[in-house]
Amino acid sequence: MKRPDYRTLQALDAVIRERGFERAAQKLCITQSAVSQRIKQLENMFGQPLLVRTVPPRPTEQGQKLLALLRQVELLEEEWLGDEQTGSTPLLLSLAVNADSLATWLLPALAPVLADSPIRLNLQVEDETRTQERLRRGEVVGAVSIQHQALPSCLVDKLGALDYLFVASRPFAERYFPNGVTRSSLLKAPAVAFDHLDDMHQAFLQQNFDLPPGSVPCHIVNSSEAFVQLARQGTTCCMIPHLQIEKELESGELINLTPGLLQRRMLYWHRFAPESRMMRKVTDALLEYGHKVLRQD
C-alpha cells in the first residue's frame, strides 16, 4: 500500500491554496525548487500526475483524493493531540457555503462554536449547486449544498430549505408591472444574478411564465446583500430568500410580486467521515440552528 509523506502532501496543498509554486514556497518557507521536488516525489510514488500545471494550477482526480485525505488527517490530528496543544494553535476549518446561507443563517449558527472553540474559519463562497465539488476536490472539509447524495467517504444531513420570493420595490412594480406580472412585462424588467452560472431567476421565469433562458435583461452582482439593496432602491426585481427580507416585506419596502409562487432550495450539510470532535461541534451547531430557521417540510 502506498503511504504518502504528509510533508509532500502539504506542498501539493500549498500550490493549490496559494495558486502557484512561488507563493507556495513562501508559505512553506522553502525554495520553489523544493516545492517542485516534493510534488515530483508524490507523482513518482503514485505513477501519475497529481497537478495540472495551468495558471492557477489545479489538482488531477488523484490529486483531489490525496488533498481530501490530507484534510481528514489534519482534522483527526486535532482529535488526538488534545486540548492543551490545539488550544494554542487554532484549527483551520475550510468550508464551502452558498452566499445566501452566509447572508442569513450560517453565521448565527456557528456563533456558539466560534465563541468557545479554537478555530479559524475559511469560508469559500460558491453557488449551492457547486459547493460539493469543492469537497470532492479536497479544498474544504465541509460544504452546504443542494445535493442530497453523499460523496464516497463522506456524511450528509438535511439542513432545511430556503424559500426564495420574487420581489421588488413598489415603485419598480408600478413602473414595470402596472397590470401585474406577465410574460410580456417580464421581458422589460431588469433582473439580477449572482454570476453567469446562477440560473435561479431564469428557472423561476421559465417554470412559471415559459420564458426561455437569456430572455430578460440581467445584472451580474456577486453579493447576496447587494440583491436586497438593488431591490430596495428600485433597480431590479429578483429572487431573494424570505428569511433575508422579512422586515422589508413586513414594512412594505419590498413586495412579493408573485404571491403563491416561490422557489425552494433544500440544503444539505456534507463533510468527511469520520468526523473529528471539532467537526462534530460544527455539525451539531449547523443542524440545530438550521432545523430552527429553515423550512423542514
UniProtKB/Swiss-Prot annotation:
The keyword Transcription regulation applies. Residues 4-60 form the HTH lysR-type domain. CDD domains: PBP2_IciA_ArgP. Residues 21-40 bind DNA. GO terms for molecular function: DNA binding; DNA-binding transcription factor activity. Keywords: DNA-binding, Transcription, Transcription regulation. It comes from the Bacteria. Homodimer. NCBIfam families: argP, PRK03635.1, PRK13348.1. Controls the transcription of genes involved in arginine and lysine metabolism. Belongs to the LysR transcriptional regulatory family. This is HTH-type transcriptional regulator ArgP. The lineage of its organism: Bacteria, Pseudomonadati, Pseudomonadota, Gammaproteobacteria, Enterobacterales.
